[in-house]
Design a protein with these regions (language model features):
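Generic preference for hydrophobic
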Residues: 94-96, 126, 141
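Glycine-rich phosphate/pyrophosphate-binding beta-alpha loops
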Residues: 78, 103, 127-135
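Predominantly a Rossmann-like dinucleotide-binding segment in NAD(P)-dependent oxidoreductases
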Residues: 9-13, 18-105
Length: 177
């Protein structure tokens, strides 16, 4: 931007502070240790940042391209998107459906459903919005040997299988489940 060009000696950096959150550091350790095996699917529904029309109307810069540069993806969700990449790696494909001003009188996105694929074939979804008054925050990371479930960015449950899924696939009959 123009202001940065005026001061080339000044360093600019961005910090994604959620990487320092002990909860997510523990999840990263679990993933890096291979506890749940190879990534198969990740799904994050993060709709817990409800905003009213009065919120958007309170300042001219809110929910505008000129003021914020975007909507929910830029203002509320960048930390979660960073965590997804940090925890699960960089997707090789990403597609998204965005709705602009779908539930509020704004010009930027307020409802997003994204789908992505990873180099190993794993898939993922990321759903976010600012119009869910009850809100949800649930991240599931599914591997071929277990699953991590994070609820409300506060609690972590690790479910581990005694054998990898592909072994169960060959050994068990569906009636044994």
């Amino acid at each position: 931007n123009e202001e940065a060009e005026k001061h080339p000696d000044v360093k600019f950096a961005m910090m994604f502070n959620q990487r320092t959150n002990p909860l997510y550091q523990k999840v990263k350790e679990i993933l890096d240790a291979g506890t749940i095996g190879n990534l198969r699917r990740v799904s994050w529904i993060i709709t817990s940042w409800w905003r009213t029309q009065k919120y958007y109307d309170s300042s001219a810069w809110r929910a505008t391209w000129a003021g914020e540069g975007g909507g929910v993806l830029v203002n509320q969700a960048p930390h979660q998107l960073d965590l997804l990449q940090w925890l699960c790696g960089m997707p090789s494909l990403m597609e998204a459906h965005l709705k602009y001003g779908s539930h509020r009188n704004i010009t930027v996105e307020d409802d997003v459903t994204a789908y992505f694929e990873y180099p190993n074939g794993a898939t993922g979804t990321f759903i976010t919005c600012t119009h869910d008054a009850l809100g949800t925050d649930r991240l599931e990371i599914h591997g071929d040997n277990g699953k991590i479930i994070i609820t409300d960015s506060k609690s972590v449950v690790v479910k581990k299988m005694d054998k990898p899924e592909d072994v169960w696939n060959h050994e068990l009959d569906f009636r044994q489940m």
